């Protein structure tokens, strides 16, 4: 067995674990992006599956909002020129109808995103 010099020992003790930690960090960030990307639906994140009515007009809404069937009103973060469609999930696609309940698929609070990310980390990375 060869005797390592002081420079080789320094490299083995500090640089090796640093490279491993960087690779592990990059891998975890990639997995997190992959998990969060599953929830992305054309600039929206599916937070709740509550039936809701989305308010829209032919012009830009003053306060874009969605009201669930129980009367709770959510202000939507991503306003568009008009709300003419609501995403109903992968099997059903977009609902272009103007009548009946819609499914709320817009992020209403940044805290929901943080809770979602923490939930994913705790569920898929229990060692963290």
From Swiss-Prot:
<dbReference type="Pfam" id="PF03905">
    <property type="entry name" value="Corona_NS4"/>
</dbReference>
<protein>
    <recommendedName>
        <fullName>Non-structural protein 4</fullName>
    </recommendedName>
</protein>
<dbReference type="GO" id="GO:0033644">
    <property type="term" value="C:host cell membrane"/>
</dbReference>
<keyword id="KW-1043">Host membrane</keyword>
<keyword id="KW-0812">Transmembrane</keyword>
<dbReference type="InterPro" id="IPR005603">
    <property type="entry name" value="Corona_NS4"/>
</dbReference>
<comment type="similarity">
    <text>Belongs to the coronaviruses ns4/ns4.8 protein family.</text>
</comment>
<keyword id="KW-0472">Membrane</keyword>
<keyword id="KW-1133">Transmembrane helix</keyword>
<feature type="transmembrane region" description="Helical">
    <location>
        <begin position="12"/>
        <end position="32"/>
    </location>
</feature>
<dbReference type="GO" id="GO:0016020">
    <property type="term" value="C:membrane"/>
</dbReference>
């Amino acid at each position: 067995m060869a005797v390592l010099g002081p420079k080789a020992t320094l490299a083995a003790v500090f640089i090796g674990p640093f490279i491993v930690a960087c690779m592990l960090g990059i891998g975890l960030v990639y997995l997190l992006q992959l998990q969060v990307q599953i929830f992305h639906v054309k600039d929206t994140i599916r937070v709740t599956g509550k039936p809701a009515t989305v308010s829209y007009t032919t012009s830009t809404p003053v306060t874009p909002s969605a009201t669930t069937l129980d009367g709770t009103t959510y202000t939507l973060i991503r306003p568009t020129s008009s709300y003419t469609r609501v995403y109903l999930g992968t099997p059903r696609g977009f609902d272009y109808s103007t009548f009946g309940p819609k499914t709320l698929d817009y992020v209403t609070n940044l805290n929901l995103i943080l809770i979602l990310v923490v939930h994913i980390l705790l569920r898929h990375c229990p060692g963290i």
